[in-house]
Amino acid sequence: MRLSTVDLQKRLNPDKPKGLHMGLTVLIAWLAGAAFILALAPYGIWPVALVSPAILYALLVPAMTGRRAFLIGQAYGTGLWCVGAFWLYTSIHVYGDTPAWLALIMIALMGLGMGLFHGFLALIFNRVVGKQPLSFAALWILQEWMKTWLFTGFPWLFVGYAFTEQYWLSSLAPVAGVFAVSFVAVLLAASIVELLRRRGGYIIPSIALLIISSTLWLINPQWTKPKGTPDLSVSLIQGNIPQDLKWLTEYQIETLKIYATLTRDEWGRDIVLWPESSIPMFQTEAVGFISEMVAMAKETDTTWVTGIPYKDEAAFDASTDKYPPFYNSVVALGAQAEGLYKKQRLVPFGEYIPFQGVLDILPNLAGSQDIMSYSRGSDQQSPLRVRGHNLGAAICYEVAYPDTTRKNAIGTDFLLTISNDAWFGTSAGPLQHLQMVQMRALENGRWFMRATNTGVTAIIDHKGRIVERAPQFERTVLRGDIQARVGNTPFMRFGQYPILFIMTLLLILSYLGKRTKAPVRLVK
């Protein structure tokens, strides 16, 4: 049988694109990334978490130059971050007193920077590995993982979070963490594209993994079990202190009065929990107030847990020109309580200055980081001791780090997180933050108490379900009961290492497979 020139070209280069204009392709990629926010809280339209990466996959499958692939991935990532993390605009413009135009530029630059992760994903997918769903999903997971540590990390907007309450898929979280959930979702999305291209064989791994996750959901294995002690009554205090007043010296006493008043009727509960930095001064400056609260807690047999800036009680050392370190911390006080936890994962530019050594080169800024920055707590800290239980803690932003929370959860009976999301106003940021706490509860099989300044204050069970929830932007108290649990989920035992090993192996196999294939033409 003789083949025409056209038929021969199709066989040699079956993936040659039909000819979408580059500008239109980039726009579609940007919109696909921007739309992903609809999959997360507060919108919760989880199918978008399949459609969004599916569009990126479909745009990248045709043969093309590395430059074209990178621009498509970069556009997707930029749209994802400019829209998905637009809540940063509130903190930059409203509370940072940055002009609106400059705040928008800063958001755009942040989007371009974070978009590089998807840009390089697309480049590697185009040039290094075979173009098929397994390699695409594996690259996706590795770029999500890199966001937990590269350049201090910004682990937000993971695909897996869209499925937090879709237990037919999030049942994988206690086994291998949020990355496993992301992997199956992205693999399914890419496989559906291949199914539409009449390459149905690619859907088989997705179906197999969905059968596993659905089976786990149906049989409902109890990775952890109740400790066998009575549930603890807890009161979570939401002070609703305006962010523009919170750190004013003249408002500090008023803040303390607000929290003391809200707590007045809660003494006698097992645990009273105050939010992050609810005492807006160092412990050395609030000795009298703290003593009064501790006395009341002991008198009523209540454990009082509060966020507070903690300063080592050393004086300024003139010989070294160093100030004593200070920490964003949470402390357990009162009846049957002891322990201090110092935040490990600090917010870049908000709590510390990254790359501090560079400042020492500049004469006018040398040593200034000692005054401006919180210090990082050790990654080897003991749990808080509360009423005969071990209590693991995570402060604000660090609950977004799966491995940090996992390590803090080992050997504990339940968990707490305290936060101040007033920085982000009525945006989606606080609700995305809450969704991540739900995933951490599910991964570790532990109940979570979450106390915040303006919301969302909540109690979450070991399956990631919100049991009690306070309204946002109200001065209120959330009451409920929490259960102590023991045992370790597979994720707690092994962490993210198994899933990362599997992803790396898939990429190595895909790379080796690509090398055996004949080259195809590249389209600019």
Predicted feature locations:
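Membrane-embedded alpha-helical bundles of multi-pass enzymes
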Residues: 2-223, 426, 437-440, 452-460, ...
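Soluble catalytic domains of enzymes that build or remodel membrane lipids, polysaccharides, and related
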Residues: 221-498
